[in-house]
């Protein structure tokens, strides 16, 4: 190829090639050309000249349609005189063209179709109207590829000689100067080239994209096809790649062993060797640098017309007709069309392979794509994406330029729409076929073979690898994971979901239904899809593809274009971030976003907050990440071991995070901190829990819409949900989610945002080193109670903390699981006695109270303590407050929380009282009467009386054991004796009155007389409304009672009723009218009204009501009997019994005799003590 001369600079074709290209500008569209030709020109005007230059064309023909200069005419005359038509020669040495000889036949120029070696092939293959046109015949023959139309070896050799001669005549440059005259003038670089060396034509080819002159551009493009049919005709290519062809075994370099015009296979082989080298970490065979440049330059020069890539042209000719029939050739349009159909089922494998090779070359050098290089030329220059500035290897050139331009777009710079369109196409191309990314091939080869074999189309391999990274199919190496992350950044599918074909196809139906209000290609489409994750509108395949992509987007905040646009200023200011296409080895995955969300929830006092727009985006991302722990890089990284250890069976949506929260105390420190911080964040903005919000949407809309609409949550929404957890509209999923969050809050007081903000200073001061919320609540509550009881001038707990503390206390009463100590103590009892009872609404606690006598000792003690607390502060009695909610509003709207139960008891017998509430009040009264400690008012009023009169009972009682009403019974007896203090007497009177109406309020009576009540008073006990009939029944049947303890209790009742008529409801009802008439002026209490009635009964002038008179007589008879059989309670009772006894004389005689005998013994036996002298006594 020495005839081509020296190449002046790298990547240029020979001057002879460019002479031919420019010369061809004078030719018109050749007859017989296919429907996809480049265009039309002056046609046969140059046919004679081509024949002449080619070594056989006729002489003496002019070029009528070119502007004829005197120089051009002189050149033509010289050629006519010196040259005669000559037949084609056999292959000649590299030193120069074949010898010319005359003999052209009369009357016409030399015709390729008339040559003996090609005549048969031309007649068989080419249409008849092309035979007179050498260029048409040449194009026809070199485009033949079908086996049945194989061209003979002699004809191939003739064609090659013909083309070679066309490329080696130095006189073509002068013709090119005429054809491209105006173009050369416009392109200064080409006008300055020296004349006669072929450099000017080489320059024109370099600037082919800038040629606007139609004639010049069309013919350069047209005639290039001749050269690209054989690598040996491309000047310099043979010299640069000779050794590589041999090493790679790309075919013979000696003519004759292959079809001369089909040597494009050699270029294809070299291209494959080049891309294969990039895909191997330690390639066995390396393409030389000179040949690499030559290969890429040839690919670049063939980038506008697929006819110029001979291998691809022949491999894809049928596919072009099938898929791109209406696509006009030129400017790379056919390439792009074929790329778009690359994964069609009907695409031939050989064409798909050729297209893939072409795409891999584009990945190595963006200029191999004509459309991309042309559309983005000005933008690349504008944003300094120059190749010379590349910090990375040549293999990354396309990806680097894409990222450079994407960075400009993300910074809000203007990039032309044409360039952005091209970028979109090539980003989609990289996502569709993993093999176009050498880094993926290098880093993920093993993973692809092991996990993703057979998934090579439409981006399925990349999504398969993404699935592996998510941990669904195994483990992925760090190098592969990093390569995937880099590819995702290069393709930037977050900016336009259509880039990810697998995602696009899987989610098309969801987008059409759920996201149809968002324009196609908008970045918010992905966000919309995330919002509909795990909803009825989401399909399974879309769900998987979406989460696989989001896994990588979540690890680089820059890959969410909306977040980046709204937060890049804040990130730069607060988190010291780099540019979009810059990375830092010192900044771990997710670090920027972690920084952003830490600042997002800062208060104004803490300073350095995010802008409102950025905060909204951070919240959006947090809401989306809550869907899946794998979307939180830090969480998955730090908690990988714990997830496997504790949560391997938790596979449903959202269960993994809940599992980690449930095992918070068991997690390793780093994981515990991450989960704790996330939970603390959720407490401030529960909307981060997107799944919970979705489940609770009806409740939020009906009851919490006011707080839900607030941009700043601050824990209000969760508080509202807790308050409305038992509404009829509440669904099971929402209730479970809210309860779970409450349970998690118990683990650390920081997890209750409002509580933390209100009480953090108090906790530091009063409860240091306490972490669990329940312990903090107990600590603060105890402090508040002590200050209240001691009537401290100033509370140690601040007012705002006391208010929030009350909210927390009330919330904890709703579910036994919210009181961990009680729950742990009673777990076995719950299983034994309350297994059929559901949690929530304090139902388990109520069940334990009802089975209190059967509980284990530890649980019984805890329940008793709980009841003691509830009685001191009835507002903490969840069941009472729930059942009596409306009655409290009706009867006790102004009542203090401490006196709430007292108020309800006072209104218990009102006609307006709700039966269910009345029943609940009675239950609490029964509880109170079992132990004086459960009645705070009695305890306070009788503080001095209890130790004085009931000391023996207190001494025998064990700590934390119930007294079963013994102390209250003791006080009742003292009440009858009128020995109690006035405050205590008032409280005991109320208890006696209440228990007289309902026997269940007297625990001692119920304990000792249960059998008698069942046998003697079953009908009265079964009555729904207790009005004292059971007590009356027992009094009437006193003589039938055999059990001494029961008889004693009934006698005590009689004794109590004698002390005051109010404690005998039956008598009081019967004598109510008489009391009004005869005893109205008598002050109640201390038996005064009873004495009044007795006097009225004895006074014959007073006529009492018959029922009252009958009841009074019955009572006198009962009291008389009681006086006889009742045991003496003290010395006075004993003396009275002796004096009223029928055997009092006998008793007194025995007592007197005993005294006399004792006296006589003293007289007879003398003194007992030893006698001593007076001196000793006086000393």
Curated annotation (Swiss-Prot):
Compositional bias annotation for Low complexity: 60-84
Tissues expressing the protein: Widely expressed. Highest levels in pancreas, skeletal muscle, placenta, heart, testis and ovary. Also found in the kidney, liver, lung and brain.
Cystine pairs: none
Pfam families: Cys_rich_FGFR (PF00839)
GO BP, sorted A to Z: bone morphogenesis; negative regulation of protein processing; negative regulation of transforming growth factor beta receptor signaling pathway; protein processing; regulation of chondrocyte differentiation; transforming growth factor beta receptor signaling pathway
Source species, domain of life: Eukaryota
Designated name of the protein: Golgi apparatus protein 1
Organism classification: Eukaryota, Metazoa, Chordata, Craniata, Vertebrata
Gene for this chain: GLG1
């Amino acid at each position: 190829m020495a005839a081509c001369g020296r190449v002046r600079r790298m990547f240029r074709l020979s001057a002879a090639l460019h002479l031919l290209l420019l010369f061809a500008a004078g030719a018109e569209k050749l007859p017989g050309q296919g429907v996809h030709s480049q265009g039309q020109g002056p046609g046969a005007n140059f046919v004679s000249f081509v024949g002449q230059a080619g070594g056989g064309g006729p002489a003496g023909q002019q070029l009528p349609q070119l502007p004829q200069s005197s120089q051009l005419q002189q050149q033509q005359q010289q050629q006519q005189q010196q040259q005669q038509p000559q037949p084609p020669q056999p292959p000649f040495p590299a030193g120069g063209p074949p010898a010319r000889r005359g003999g052209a036949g009369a009357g016409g120029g030399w015709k390729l179709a008339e040559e003996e070696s090609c005549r048969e092939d031309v007649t068989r293959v080419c249409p008849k109207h092309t035979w007179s046109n050498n260029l048409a015949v040449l194009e026809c023959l070199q485009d033949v590829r079908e086996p049945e139309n194989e061209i003979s070896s002699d004809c191939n050799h003739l064609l090659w000689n013909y083309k070679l001669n066309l490329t080696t005549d130095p006189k073509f440059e002068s013709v090119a100067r005429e054809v491209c005259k105006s173009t050369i003038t416009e392109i200064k670089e080409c006008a300055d080239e020296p004349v006669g060396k072929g450099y000017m034509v080489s320059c024109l080819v370099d600037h082919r994209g800038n040629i606007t002159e139609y004639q010049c551009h069309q013919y350069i493009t047209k005639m290039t096809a001749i050269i690209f049919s054989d690598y040996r005709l491309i000047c310099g290519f043979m010299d640069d790649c000779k050794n590589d062809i041999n090493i790679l075994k790309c075919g013979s370099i000696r003519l004759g062993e292959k079809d001369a015009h089909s040597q494009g296979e050699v270029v294809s082989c070299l291209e494959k060797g080049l891309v294969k080298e990039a895909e191997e970490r330690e390639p066995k065979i390396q393409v030389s640098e000179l040949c690499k440049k030559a290969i890429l330059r040839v690919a670049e020069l063939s980038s506008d017309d697929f006819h110029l890539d001979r291998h691809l042209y022949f491999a894809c000719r049928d596919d072009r007709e099938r898929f791109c029939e209406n696509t006009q050739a030129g400017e790379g349009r056919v390439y792009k069309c074929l790329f778009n159909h690359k994964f069609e089922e009907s695409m031939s494998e050989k064409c798909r392979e050729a297209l893939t090779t072409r795409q891999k070359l584009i990945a190595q050098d963006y200029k191999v794509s004509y459309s991309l290089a042309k559309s983005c030329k000005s933008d690349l220059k504008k944003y300094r994406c120059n190749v010379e500035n590349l910090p990375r290897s040549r293999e990354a050139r396309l990806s680097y330029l894409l990222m450079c331009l994407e960075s400009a777009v993300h910074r809000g710079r203007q990039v032309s729409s044409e360039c952005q369109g091209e970028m979109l196409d090539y980003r989609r191309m990289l996502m569709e076929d993993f093999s176009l990314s050498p880094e993926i091939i290098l880093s993920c080869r093993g993973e692809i073979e092991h996990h993703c074999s057979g998934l090579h189309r439409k981006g399925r391999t990349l999504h398969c690898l993404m699935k592996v990274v998510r941990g669904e199919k195994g483990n992925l190496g760090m190098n592969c994971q990093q390569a995937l992350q880099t590819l995702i950044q290069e393709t930037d599918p977050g900016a336009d979901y259509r880039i990810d074909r697998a995602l696009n196809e899987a989610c098309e139906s969801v987008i059409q239904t759920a996201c149809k209000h968002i324009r196609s290609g908008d970045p918010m489409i992905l966000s919309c899809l995330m919002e509909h994750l795990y909803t009825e509108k989401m399909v399974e395949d879309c769900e998987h593809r979406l989460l696989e992509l989001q896994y990588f987007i979540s690890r680089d905040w820059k890959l969410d274009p909306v977040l980046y646009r709204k937060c890049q200023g804040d990130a730069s200011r607060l988190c010291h971030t780099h540019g979009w296409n810059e990375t830092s080895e010192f900044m771990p995955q997710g670090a920027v976003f972690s920084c952003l969300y830490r600042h997002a929830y800062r208060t104004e006092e803490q300073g350095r907050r995010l802008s409102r727009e950025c905060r909204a985006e951070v919240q959006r991302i947090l809401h989306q990440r809550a869907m899946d722990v794998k979307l939180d890089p830090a969480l998955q990284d730090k908690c990988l071991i714990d997830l496997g250890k504790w949560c391997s069976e938790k596979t449903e949506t959202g269960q993994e995070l809940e599992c980690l929260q449930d095992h918070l105390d068991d997690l390793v420190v780093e994981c515990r901190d991450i989960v704790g911080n996330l939970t603390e964040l959720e407490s401030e903005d529960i909307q981060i829990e997107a799944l919970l919000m979705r489940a609770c949407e009806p409740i939020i809309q009906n009851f919490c819409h006011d707080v839900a609409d607030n941009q700043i949550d601050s824990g209000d929404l969760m508080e509202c949900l807790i308050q409305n957890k038992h509404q009829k509209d509440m669904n099971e999923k929402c209730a479970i989610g809210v309860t779970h969050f409450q349970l998690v809050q118990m683990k650390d007081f920081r997890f209750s945002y409002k509580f933390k903000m209100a009480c953090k200073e108090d906790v530091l001061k009063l409860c240091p080193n306490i972490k669990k919320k329940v312990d903090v609540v107990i600590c603060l509550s105890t402090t508040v109670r002590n200050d209240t009881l001691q009537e401290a001038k100033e509370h140690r707990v601040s007012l705002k903390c006391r208010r929030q503390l009350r909210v927390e206390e009330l919330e904890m009463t709703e579910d036994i699981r919210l009181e961990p100590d009680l729950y742990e103590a009673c777990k076995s009892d719950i299983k034994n006695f309350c297994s059929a009872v559901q949690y929530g609404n304090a139902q388990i606690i109520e069940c334990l109270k009802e089975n209190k006598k059967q509980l284990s000792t530890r649980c019984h003690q805890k329940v008793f303590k709980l009841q003691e607390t509830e009685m001191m502060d009835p507002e903490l009695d969840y069941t009472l407050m729930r059942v009596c909610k409306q009655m409290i509003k009706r009867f006790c709207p102004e009542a203090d929380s401490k006196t709430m139960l007292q108020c309800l008891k006072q209104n218990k017998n009102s006609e307006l009282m709700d039966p269910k509430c009345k029943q609940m009040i009675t239950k609490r009264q029964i509880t109170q009467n079992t132990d004086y400690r459960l009645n705070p008012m009695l305890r306070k009023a009788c503080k001095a009386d209890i130790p004085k009169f009931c000391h023996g009972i207190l001494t025998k009682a064990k700590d934390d054991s119930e007294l079963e009403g013994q102390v209250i019974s003791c006080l009742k007896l003292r009440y009858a004796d009128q020995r109690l203090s006035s405050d205590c007497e008032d409280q005991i009177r109320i208890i006696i009155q209440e228990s007289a109406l309902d026997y269940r309020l007297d625990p001692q009576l119920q304990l000792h007389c249960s059998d008698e009540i069942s046998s003697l008073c079953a009908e009265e006990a079964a009555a729904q409304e207790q009005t004292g009939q059971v007590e009356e029944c027992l009094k009437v049947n006193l003589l039938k009672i055999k059990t001494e303890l029961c008889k004693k209790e009934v006698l005590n009742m009689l004794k109590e009723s004698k002390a005051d008529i109010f404690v005998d409801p039956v008598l009081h009802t019967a004598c109510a009218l008489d009391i009004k008439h005869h005893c109205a002026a008598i002050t109640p209490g201390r038996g005064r009204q009873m004495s009044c009635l007795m006097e009225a009964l004895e006074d014959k002038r007073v006529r009492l009501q018959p029922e009252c008179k009958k009841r009074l007589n019955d009572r006198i008879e009962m009291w008389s009997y009681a006086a006889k059989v009742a045991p003496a309670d003290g010395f006075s009772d004993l003396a009275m019994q002796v004096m009223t006894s029928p055997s009092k004389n006998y008793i007194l005689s025995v007592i007197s005799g005993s005294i006399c005998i004792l006296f006589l013994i003293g007289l007879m036996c003398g003194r007992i003590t030893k006698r001593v002298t007076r001196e000793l006594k006086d000393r």
